[in-house]
Structure formats: structure tokens, C-alpha cells
Amino acid sequence: MSTGPSHISVCIACRNEADRLGACLESVAWADERIVMDLGSTDDSVAVAERNGARVVRRDAVPIVELIRNEIAAHATHDWILVLDPDERVTPGLAAELRRAAGREDVDAVVMPRMNWDLGYPPSNPNERYEQQLRMYRKSRVQWPVIPNALPQVPDSRTYRVPSTDDTVLVHDRNRNIPEVLDRIVRYAPLQAQSMIDRGQVFSARAMFVSLGTRAKRQFIDGKAWRDGVPGMLRAAILVGFHFYIWAAFWQLSGARRTPEDDRFVQRVGRWLERGQHGYRAVTAPARIVGGLGDRARRMFRRA
């Protein structure tokens, strides 16, 4: 039971995150309560949590945290729940916004900008730099959906949106290295694919190509990934690749059936690319440009 409209409980699910959990907890030292649900850590995660003043609750591991968001919230003393992962940190500016929002009777949820860091760098494009995340809510009025990567849906009239600035972000230090990328894919791709099946979606090659093409356009072209150099291009490739694995899992979990309709569509795409005047030249343009620059550089060095 909440002891007041402005009291906030921070809820964190954790498994073997001792190297990052401390910074996460320190960033919310201002909160009225901090709960860490440990999922069978074999490192010093529990000691780190207790050393930082958090209350530790233990349970068996689960593949994804969405399965236990509501369970963690049930352990909280207060109505306002701030959901964090161990690889996230609340900036001082965001903390001030959250405390103000918690004191408003007309608000049931708070959407905040999250800045995702991949391979040590955040995106510079404003459209990609600030990912809108509903991460604070009243548990008496909102339930967390048990779906991979899903967020609660709350009417805009009952939602407060934190301004998107670097001073008011939730810092997300994800995908620090390739093993972390692969771990995320292995855990989430099959479950997201299964959720697509559970919602009644039917696999088709056309839908897969449209989805992946749309995501590639968003990341590489609309998101101007090239402006962030190698980290930007790798980030875009990781995000598109993640969805490729979701579709691969979707096809496999749907029965891995090869159908004439899918074959015809894929073959049409292949012939279109093979003609070389449109898609093939567009797809191979980066390689041809790099190759041309390399040839030019070699000629310059030979002349020198």
C-alpha cells in the first residue's frame, strides 16, 4: 500500500550483473525503496545490491524479464513503480522529472526518453537518440504485459512525457560487446517469434522482406547511421540483424514449410536484383564505391 502519492519504489530484475548493478542503484539512491529480484546470480550481484541499500528478493531464473515485471512490483511497498534494468542509469535531470510526476494526481504513467548505447556509443540522430519508454506507473492502475519487449499501454490523457534532452534521459548501456549482442538475440528472438504466432500472425516471405526492408531503411537511411562512423553502421546492422533472427525463428516455429507462394516471391526478388539496373546496383553500391576508392588510393601510392 502506498504511503503517499509521491513515494516511488524502484524494481530491478538481476542475474549476474555485479559490474553494472552498483551504478544503476546509485543513480536512484533518492528513491523511497529499491528492490532487486535476483534470478540466481553466481557473481556478487546480491552483495552489490545489499551494499547499496536495496532489498533483495530471490527467485528462479526466467528467460526474459517481462515474465516477472508484475511479480517484482507486487513486492513493492509503494504504488508508483519505476522499472529499471541493471544496465540502465537515471540521470539527475530525469530523477527530478520523475519525482515531480509522482506528485500529480492526474498522471498514472510516465514516458521517458531512453538513450541506448551500443558498442560504447549512442546514436547522434535525434530520432534514434531518444527512445520513448513507459517505465514508471501506478501499479494499482497499470499492469505490465507478459510479452517480449512490450510496454504498458496507458491513455495519453493519463501519461506524463518527460522532455527529450540529454539531461533527462534514462541511459541504457546495452550491447557492450558481441557476446552480449548474441545473448540478447538467443534469449529474445524465439520468444518474440512465438508471440507473433500467439497473436495469429502467419509467416510469409513477402511480410518478412517488407518488415526487414523497412527496418533497414529506418536504421541506415532515415537514421543516417553513417554519420556515426563504424559504431553507427554496426549498431544499425545489429538492430536489423536482430529482427532477421526473429523472422528466422518465426519461420522455423511456424513449421519451417517451403511454399510455392513464398518461392515465387523470393525468386521474383532475386530476378529483380539480378537484372543489375535497380536493386542489385543499389545493394552493391557501397561495395563498389569502397572498391573504387581503394583502386584510386593504390594508384596514388604507386605514383608517389
Where are these regions (language model features)?
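Short, structured coil segments at secondary-structure junctions
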Residues: W30, R51-G53, Q132
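A conserved acidic beta->alpha catalytic loop
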Residues: S27, D38-V48, A61, D85
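N-proximal low-complexity "stem/linker" segments adjacent to membrane-targeting elements
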Residues: M1-S27
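Long, positively charged, glycine-interspersed low-complexity recognition regions
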Residues: W251, R257-A304
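Conserved donor nucleotide-binding strand/loop of the catalytic core
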Residues: V46-H75
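Residues at the starts of beta-strands that form the adenosine-phosphate
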Residues: H7, D32-E33
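Catalytic-site signature of metal-activated, phosphate-bearing donor transferases
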Residues: E66-A73, W80, T91-R257
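Acidic helix N-cap motif at the loop->helix transition within catalytic regions
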Residues: D19-G22, D43-N52, G93-L94
